[in-house]
């Protein structure tokens, strides 16, 4: 047998093997529903089974895990859902979640990270294994507590399972057993998922043991808020201290308690925001990144509106937004100041019209430029985190342009009114 014929025979054998593998695993390149058994402790807030979705590829072992966003809750009304800041998916996750356009995932198109081919944006993880970690627990993927809420309907109390942290760990365990060890892993999430990806980073890191790993947490900042701070010092303190209790964050089995117990260098149990920099300290070879807008109107409302009557009862919506942004901007500076590890970075443009300047990575990366630093969009930050070359990017827009100069920004502005 000649070398040429040997190579041809070998190539054919490899091709047949690959095709056989693809045929044997019909779920490649499409969404596969995974329902976690009750024995894992995983559940949605209403007690229904927890389901998440996987879109696999046989071509590499790299993986991106997307933590879904949505509102949150700590009372009966909000846990029933129905409005922007309330719990999303209050009735659980149906089996057809990723094929139902009316669901928040929008067939995976909600972010460029969760679509093989996205009509508006390319990102290198589109060729990776994709895991969509759904959100149905009203606790920004961090809780481990069961509560009974009856404040709006005492005759019909609601038992609600804040099991976000349990769900996340169960997903990581499933991945470790059913998927290859990742050569490269990106943990990301938007809004509530931005918090979730940050808070559960260590769990995925230690469970999956990827060769390389990065975090891109979008618009779910854990601000630098000591437990004993006053509202004047740290406006988010009322929110932080509320969710500590209702979601069991620093209870004996709480996520914060367990994280700091395992990794004392990760931060301080009395300041949940300390993990922002803490991840860079305990995982010095990883690249840790945070992104959001300076004029975010949604997460700021979640953080302050229920706790400050002057905001909730503002005379006009413009007044409400102005008061929200004053508090929001007050907390950005100390949040950034604590990011001292050199492997921690951020990308913080001023605003865009899409979704009330909430989330830089949903729909499209357009509208996220920082022109003064010659950065076209947040995708350059994502590439910086993933490529692992040079210092981790730190970009903060200080000179917002009064008129768009990039076509991608103009397109995002045109698109904004079309997005519900």
Kindly label every feature range from the protein language model:
Residues 12-21:
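Bacterial N-terminal signal peptides
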Residues 1-9:
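N-terminal secretory signal peptides that target proteins for export/translocation
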């Amino acid at each position: 047998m000649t070398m040429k014929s040997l190579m041809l025979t070998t190539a054919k054998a490899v091709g047949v093997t690959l095709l056989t593998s693809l045929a044997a695993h019909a779920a490649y390149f499409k969404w596969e529903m995974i329902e976690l058994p009750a024995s894992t402790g995983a559940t949605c807030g209403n007690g229904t089974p927890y389901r998440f979705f996987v879109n696999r590829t046989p071509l590499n072992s790299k993986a991106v895990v997307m933590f879904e966003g949505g509102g949150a809750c700590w009372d009966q009304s909000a846990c029933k859902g129905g409005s922007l800041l309330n719990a999303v998916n209050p009735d659980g996750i149906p089996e057809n979640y990723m094929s139902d356009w009316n669901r928040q995932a929008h067939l995976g198109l909600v972010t460029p990270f969760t679509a093989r081919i996205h009509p508006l944006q390319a990102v290198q993880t589109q060729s990776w294994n994709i895991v969509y970690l759904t959100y149905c627990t009203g606790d920004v993927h961090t809780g481990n507590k069961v509560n009974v809420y009856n404040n709006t309907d005492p005759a019909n109390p609601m038992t609600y399972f804040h099991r976000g942290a349990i769900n996340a760990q169960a997903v990581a365990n499933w991945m470790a057993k059913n998927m290859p060890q990742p050569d490269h892993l990106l943990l990301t999430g938007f809004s509530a998922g931005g918090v979730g990806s940050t808070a559960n980073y260590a769990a995925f890191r230690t469970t999956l043991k990827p060769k390389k790993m990065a975090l891109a947490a979008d618009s779910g900042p854990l601000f630098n808020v000591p437990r004993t701070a006053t509202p004047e010092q740290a406006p988010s303190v009322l929110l932080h201290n509320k969710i500590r209790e209702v979601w069991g964050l620093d209870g004996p089995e709480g996520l914060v308690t367990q994280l700091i117990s395992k990794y004392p260098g990760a931060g301080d149990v009395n300041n949940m925001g300390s993990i922002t920099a803490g991840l860079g300290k305990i995982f010095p070879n990883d690249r840790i990144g945070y992104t959001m807008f300076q004029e975010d109107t949604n997460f700021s409302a979640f953080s302050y509106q229920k706790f400050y009557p002057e905001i909730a009862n503002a005379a006009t919506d413009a007044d409400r937004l102005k008061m929200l942004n004053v508090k929001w901007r007050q907390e950005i500076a100390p949040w950034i100041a604590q990011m001292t590890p050199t492997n921690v970075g951020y990308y913080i443009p001023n605003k865009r019209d899409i979704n009330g300047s909430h989330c830089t990575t949903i729909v499209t990366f357009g509208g996220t430029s920082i022109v003064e630093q010659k950065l076209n969009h947040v995708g350059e930050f994502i590439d910086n985190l993933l490529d692992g070359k040079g210092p981790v990017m730190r970009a903060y827009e200080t000179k917002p342009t009064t008129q768009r100069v990039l076509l991608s920004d103009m397109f995002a502005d045109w698109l904004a009114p079309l997005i519900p």
